[in-house]
Amino acid sequence: MATLQCRVVSAREEIYAGEISMLIATGSEGEVGILAGHTPLITLLKPGSMRIQTPDGNEEVIYVSGGVLEVQPKLVTVLADTAVRAHDLDEAKIVEARKKAEQMLANQTETLQTNAALASLAESVAQLQTIRKYRNRA
């Protein structure tokens, strides 16, 4: 199978660099799969899991909180706001953050608080979905 190079970079660090056979992520228009030879593309990423398949058949699952996906003829670059390998996500902390966001929504008094709570809730849900996808593959 044909391959291409991939780099996943967050504001803090490079999460992944290497050869891949496929990448699947959630873009602004829905789920997108990238294989070697894909047409050039730039799209915004939505919060959620991103799957990287390596040429040897292994799969990496990475949570991204948003960012940009750029596809060039031989290179895929992901510039993520936040990127964390699924096995590094702390489920207990995420569940606690989700509960806190739900409580904030229940006790809302201002639109700004509502927006912050909704954003926090969406991030927690996306992280939990990433953990579940990772567990199903492990």
Curated annotation (Swiss-Prot):
- The answer to whether the entry has keyword Cell inner membrane is yes
GO cellular component assignments: plasma membrane; proton-transporting ATP synthase complex
Q: Does the keyword Cell membrane apply?
A: yes
**Which GO MF terms are attached to this record?**
ATP binding; proton-transporting ATP synthase activity, rotational mechanism
Arranged from A to Z, the UniProt key words for this protein are:
ATP synthesis, Cell inner membrane, Cell membrane, CF(1), Hydrogen ion transport, Ion transport, Membrane, Transport
Family matches, as CDD domains: F1-ATPase_delta
Provide the topology term for how it sits in the membrane: Peripheral membrane protein
Q: Where in the cell is it found?
A: Cell inner membrane
Domain of life from the UniProt record: Bacteria
Cross-referenced InterPro entries, in alphabetical order?
ATP_F1_dsu/esu_C_sf (IPR036794), ATP_synth_F1_dsu/esu (IPR001469), ATP_synth_F1_dsu/esu_N (IPR020546), ATPsynth_dsu/esu_N (IPR036771)
The protein's assembly and partners: F-type ATPases have 2 components, CF(1) - the catalytic core - and CF(0) - the membrane proton channel. CF(1) has five subunits: alpha(3), beta(3), gamma(1), delta(1), epsilon(1). CF(0) has three main subunits: a, b and c.
The similarity annotation says: Belongs to the ATPase epsilon chain family.
Output this protein's name. ATP synthase epsilon chain
Which source organism?
A: Psychrobacter sp. (strain PRwf-1)
